[in-house]
């Protein structure tokens, strides 16, 4: 059910129900939000970026799409306006119930179901290209083996994401094996910082490599980053997401073909 739409920056946000009884606290509703930039027209199908937030200590709706550390809607507007990315829709569910523990985040989430809900919300304003769906998860969204990006990686639904992006998530052997279960044509990217969170990245890479057969070889990538900002765990999100989207939505490429330093510098003024 579409609940409301609102102007945000240069585009428009559409809020909708998505498993509200399961994911939200009582009296909260409309946990889904889809953002359509002004450059998107209904005439041409566009990519969809699905963003799964991490631990939600303040029980906020729409983290990263209007609440929380930063507003990715504003980032997307900037990236499209300066020609870094093609027009795209950004959509995200919200979880406030049991949202303090990474192991409980996004249990049972179904990508096909969420994409369908987002499509209904933006009907008449945008069309989604099912061949250009990217899923990104921050922090605890990549820790639950039965949920979040790890469940989506193992799923074999109708929507086959072109990329799954782990943004400073859990990184150990189990997570590596879980992400490696993605379809061969789904590219996997992992970004992490070590200022605030030390992880067994070698174990992650080994676990991933034991399961994964890349197609084509070398199409997945893992990158240690040094984000600018007072809180590196959050400051990592925007520049890393931009780099990943640039790689995934461009011609077949590797991150070396994308100037990540330039992207990070351009976004430094936007980091809160």
Ranges and model annotations:
Residues 1-48, 56, 88, 207-213, ...:
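A domain-start/cap signature at the N-terminus of enzymes
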Residues 40, 44, 102-140:
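Gly/Ser-rich "nucleophile elbow"/oxyanion-hole loop immediately N-terminal to the catalytic nucleophile
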Residues 48, 52-119:
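Active-site machinery of serine-nucleophile hydrolases
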Residues 48-52, 89-93, 132-137, 163-167, ...:
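Structural recognition of the beta-strand scaffold that forms the well-ordered cores
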Residues 51-62, 123, 138, 150, ...:
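Cell-envelope and extracellular/periplasmic
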Residues 58-61, 99-102, 143-145, 172-177, ...:
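Extracytoplasmic/secreted cell-surface and envelope-processing proteins
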Residues 130-184:
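Primarily recognizes the serine-hydrolase "nucleophile elbow" in alpha/beta-hydrolase
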Residues 189-272:
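C-terminal catalytic histidine-bearing segment of alpha/beta-hydrolase fold enzymes
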């Amino acid at each position: 059910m579409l609940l409301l739409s609102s102007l945000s920056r240069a585009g428009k946000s559409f809020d909708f129900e998505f498993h509200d009884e399961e994911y939200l606290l009582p009296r909260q509703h409309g946990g889904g939000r889809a953002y359509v930039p002004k450059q998107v027209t209904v005439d041409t199908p566009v990519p969809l970026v699905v963003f799964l937030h991490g631990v939600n200590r303040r029980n906020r709706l729409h983290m990263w799409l209007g609440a929380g550390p930063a507003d990715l809607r504003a980032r997307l507007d900037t990236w499209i306006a300066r020609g870094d990315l093609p027009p795209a829709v950004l959509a995200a569910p919200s979880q406030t119930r049991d949202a303090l523990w990474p192991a409980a985040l996004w249990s049972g989430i179904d990508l096909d179901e969420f994409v369908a809900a987002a499509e209904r919300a933006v009907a008449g304003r945008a069309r989604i290209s099912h061949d250009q769906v990217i899923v990104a998860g921050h922090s605890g969204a990549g820790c639950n083996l039965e949920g979040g990006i790890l469940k989506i990686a193992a799923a074999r639904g109708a929507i086959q994401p072109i990329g799954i992006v782990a943004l400073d998530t859990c990184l150990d052997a189990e997570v590596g094996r879980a992400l490696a279960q993605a379809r061969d044509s789904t590219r996997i990217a992992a970004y992490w910082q070590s200022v605030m969170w030390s992880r067994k990245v070698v174990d992650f890479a080994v676990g991933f490599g034991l399961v994964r057969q890349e197609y084509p070889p070398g199409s997945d990538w893992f990158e240690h980053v040094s984000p600018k900002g007072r809180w590196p765990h959050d400051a990592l999100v925007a520049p890393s997401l931009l780099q990943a989207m640039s790689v995934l939505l461009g011609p077949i490429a590797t991150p070396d073909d994308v100037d990540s330093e330039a992207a990070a510098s351009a976004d430094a003024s936007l980091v809160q």
